[in-house]
Structures are given as structure tokens and as C-alpha cells.
């Protein structure tokens, strides 16, 4: 049995979850400690104030003492958009390490959302729901992520800066009367979501919405759900709930739903987002599994150490996402499949020579699928255009550094290799060697493709 601690430094709340993991019983949550500290000021200023920094370090020191009490075998601490968007992130992380001993990983948006998907998969019912058209709505403090699943495969994903704290900050700057907040918020959301609808929802039928957030999920699991604790809510119940929010004061909402008063403004914003997405998709059912980023961390840890049977093929989701990007930029499907087959055969046959692993194989696979996406912009400047497209497009499940590796592989498939890039582009030695090896494999695969 292993004892694992997951720490989430969120924009509005910091949480610690303690788990035990066994092969027979799987993952079991032992304790969940939450602390309210608003870090959302970074969205406006780009910095953490000294007072907030002191408070955050005090919280993390307390977390360390709790972990010592539980004698945890391992831990992972992650920070999301509030820390990610600071201007001096490296200094903040160094201060936290020096003052608390906690090594904090700052997740890119795609890494954060990928962990959230893993947390959903750790709950039963995920595989069955995504067999039909499903939209996963992941609501954070700084942004929301909308991902479409069709026939249990991830088909498209899009990030939008419509997080609850960011919207609250924007609304407070507009300085409107409380009675105007609702209509103005709907107007803001509708303007942004209409773009998503035009791009991704033309011919799709969405039957289910899976909601991941810190506010409305708790209510759906409690009072709002069809059956208490099930987390399922139908369209009519959602409409009744929204009408209640509009017609009642904050104190009435606090008493009726038994929720903290400071949560109500963010609850209203989160509910408005869910309502607008439900109207846009015309979904029949909303499911709130009540998971958090911490659940994704422990799932990934258990998966890595083979303490848990795999529930869903997440690697295939990354590949499907890359195929969708290739299709959007009118890449050649047949050519990409041929190149993928040749490149992966070379990779698998030369493992003793190149010494790379499964993750690098995935990066090569994505590079083959996106090898010609730059043609959408320019048939001449193909390498640079492909690089620009890949760096500007989010590939769910890949970190920023991994996306940069893929972009460079595709770039130097069309251009002469720049051997000085290790020193000039902030790429470390290990990443540089990965780019060199995978570019060489892709170039050989290119030369061996008779159809080209």
C-alpha cells in the first residue's frame, strides 16, 4: 500500500488530498483539507502581493506538517493559472521552495485539463457517457476548457478565457448595478461561445455535458441532482435552478443551498457558464462527477507505477486531437498515415540505437500527423508556418515544452537543421537531442515514402 498526497494551488482555493493506493482496492481518499485564499489578483496585475505570498507560504507549511503526520510515501504539488500568469513565476516558485520545502509544478493549460480528464475517468460511468456526443466543460478561475467526445474519442478541444475569477474581475471593472450583472454576463458569454459553436458544433449532436468546477458541482451532487449523490441533472431541473438564482438574494441562496456566502458570486458566474453552454448544445443531461485536479494527480501517479488498471486510452485522445488539427489545416490524411507507419517502424526497429521511450514515440507520431499543416498558410515557407501553427495550437495532454519539440521536428523536416538552437532558443540538452533524433527519423521516413 502507498500513501500519496496531492496538493493543488488553485486561483481561489488551495487543497490537499491524502490517498491510499492498493492494487486490490484501487484509490481511496483518506482526507481532504481546503483553504480559501484568492490569488486571482494576478490576472489583473501579473504579480502576487507580499501579503498574499506570506499567506500562501503559511498554508503550504501547514500542508507539509499534515503530510508528515500521515507519513506519505510521495506527493505532487501543482499550481494553475494564477501562478502561471505571474510575470515573475520563477521567483515565486523559488521563494515557495525556500520557505516551505514544497516543489511546485506550474501546469500548462493543456496539462491541467488533461489531469482533469483523468480525474473524471477515475469515476465510474465516464466510458459509457462518452459513447454518445458529450461535451466536457472544465471551469477554472482563469479560463474554461470545452472538449468534445464522440464515440468515446476526443474530437476537439478549445480553451477560452472565461474563468470565474477572470469574469468577476472584468465585471467589477465595468462597475454596473447588481441588477444588470446577469444580462451583461450572458452577453459576454454568448459573444465568445458563438465562435465555438460555429467552429465545432455545426453537425454535432451533444446529448451530455460533464461539468468540472468548484461551485455548481457540489450543488448538483447534493440538492440539485436527480438522486442525491448521483451528480446527474436534467435540462428542466437546470432551468428551474437558474430561475431560483435570478429571483433570490445572496442570503436566501446561502440558506437554501447551505453554501458559504463568499462562494455565491462565483456560483452565479459558474452557473451562468453552464447554462449558456447547455443552451448552445441543447444537451439533455448534465453530469457533475465532483472531481478535482488532485484526483487526476493520484490517478496519473497510480497509472505511472502500474498500481491501477487503465480505464481509458488517453494517449489515443492526444493522437485524435492531433488528427483533428491536421484536418482543420487541410493536411493530407493518406500521406500522414503512410509517414506515420514508416516513421514508427523505424523508431521501433532502432530502440537500442536511439534509446528513446514511449513518450518520444508519441511525439514522433504527432509530428508525422502535423508534418504539412503549414501548407494552409504558405506552400513556400512551409517549415516556419508549420512551427507557428503548432506553437499557437493547444494539443491537450502535451506540455508547452513537448509541443515545442514537435514544432521543431516539423520545422526542420522542411528546413536545414540549426545545430546552434540548443544555445539560442532556451532548449536544454535532453530536449535538443530528442529533436535531433526524431527529426532524423522523420526525414528518413520522408525519403522512404514512395507516394511522395
Q: Which functions belong to the PLM regions below?
A:
Residues 26-36, 155-162, 314:
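Short coil-to-beta-strand
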Residues 23-45, 68:
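Conserved ATP-binding subdomain of kinase catalytic cores across diverse folds
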Residues 4, 42-66, 82-87, 98-131, ...:
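Helical "lid/coupling" subdomains associated with nucleotide-phosphate turnover
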Residues 74-75:
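Post-signal peptide N-terminal segment of secreted/secretory-pathway proteins
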Residues 1-28, 128-157, 211-214, 219:
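Gly/Thr-rich phosphate-binding beta-strand-loop-beta motif of the actin/hexokinase/Hsp70
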Amino acid at each position: 500500500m502507498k500513501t500519496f498526497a496531492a496538493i493543488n494551488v488553485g486561483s481561489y482555493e488551495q487543497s490537499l488530498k491524502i490517498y491510499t493506493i492498493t492494487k486490490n482496492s484501487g484509490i481511496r481518499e483518506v482526507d481532504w483539507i481546503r483553504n480559501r485564499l484568492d490569488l486571482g489578483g494576478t490576472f489583473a496585475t501579473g504579480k502576487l502581493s507580499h501579503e498574499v505570498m506570506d499567506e500562501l507560504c503559511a498554508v503550504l507549511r501547514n500542508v507539509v506538517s499534515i503530510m508528515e503526520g500521515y507519513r506519505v510515501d510521495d506527493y505532487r504539488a501543482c499550481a494553475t493559472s494564477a501562478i502561471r500568469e505571474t510575470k515573475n513565476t520563477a521567483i515565486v516558485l523559488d521563494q515557495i521552495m525556500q520557505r516551505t520545502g514544497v516543489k511546485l509544478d506550474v501546469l500548462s493549460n493543456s496539462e491541467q485539463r488533461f489531469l482533469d480528464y483523468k480525474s473524471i475517468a477515475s469515476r465510474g460511468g465516464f466510458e459509457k457517457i462518452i459513447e454518445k456526443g458529450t461535451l466536457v466543460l472544465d471551469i477554472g478561475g482563469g479560463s474554461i476548457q470545452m472538449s468534445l467526445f464522440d464515440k468515446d474519442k476526443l474530437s476537439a478541444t478549445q480553451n477560452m478565457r472565461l474563468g470565474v475569477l477572470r469574469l468577476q474581475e472584468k465585471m467589477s471593472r465595468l462597475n454596473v448595478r447588481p441588477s444588470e450583472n446577469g444580462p451583461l454576463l450572458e452577453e459576454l458569454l454568448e459573444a465568445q461561445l458563438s465562435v465555438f459553436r460555429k467552429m465545432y458544433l455545426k453537425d454535432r449532436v451533444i446529448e451530455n455535458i460533464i461539468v468540472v468546477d468548484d461551485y455548481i458541482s457540489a450543488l448538483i451532487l447534493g440538492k440539485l441532482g436527480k438522486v442525491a449523490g448521483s451528480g446527474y441533472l436534467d435540462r428542466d431541473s437546470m432551468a428551474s435552478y437558474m430561475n431560483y438564482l435570478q429571483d433570490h438574494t445572496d442570503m436566501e441562496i446561502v440558506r437554501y443551498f447551505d453554501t458559504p456566502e463568499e462562494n455565491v458570486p462565483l456560483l452565479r458566474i459558474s452557473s451562468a457558464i453552464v447554462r449558456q453552454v447547455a443552451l448552445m448544445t441543447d444537451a439533455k443531461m448534465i453530469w457533475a462527477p465532483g472531481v478535482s485536479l488532485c484526483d487526476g494527480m493520484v490517478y496519473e501517479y497510480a497509472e505511472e507505477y502500474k498500481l491501477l488498471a487503465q480505464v481509458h486510452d488517453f494517449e489515443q485522445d492526444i493522437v485524435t486531437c492531433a488528427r483533428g488539427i491536421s484536418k482543420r489545416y487541410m493536411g493530407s490524411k493518406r500521406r500522414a498515415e503512410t509517414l506515420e507507419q514508416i516513421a514508427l517502424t523505424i523508431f521501433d526497429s532502432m530502440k537500442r540505437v536511439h534509446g528513446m521511450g514511449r513518450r518520444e514515440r508519441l511525439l514522433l507520431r504527432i509530428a508525422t500527423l502535423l508534418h504539412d499543416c503549414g501548407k494552409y498558410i504558405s506552400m513556400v515557407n512551409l517549415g516556419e508556418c508549420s512551427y507557428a501553427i503548432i506553437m499557437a495550437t493547444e494539443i491537450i495532454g502535451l506540455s508547452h515544452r513537448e509541443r515545442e519539440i514537435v514544432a521543431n521536428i516539423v520545422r526542420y523536416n522542411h528546413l536545414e537543421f540549426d545545430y546552434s538552437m540548443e544555445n539560442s532558443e532556451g532548449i536544454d540538452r535532453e530536449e535538443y537531442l530528442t529533436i535531433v533524433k526524431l527529426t532524423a527519423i522523420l526525414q528518413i521516413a520522408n525519403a522512404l515514402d514512395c507516394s511522395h
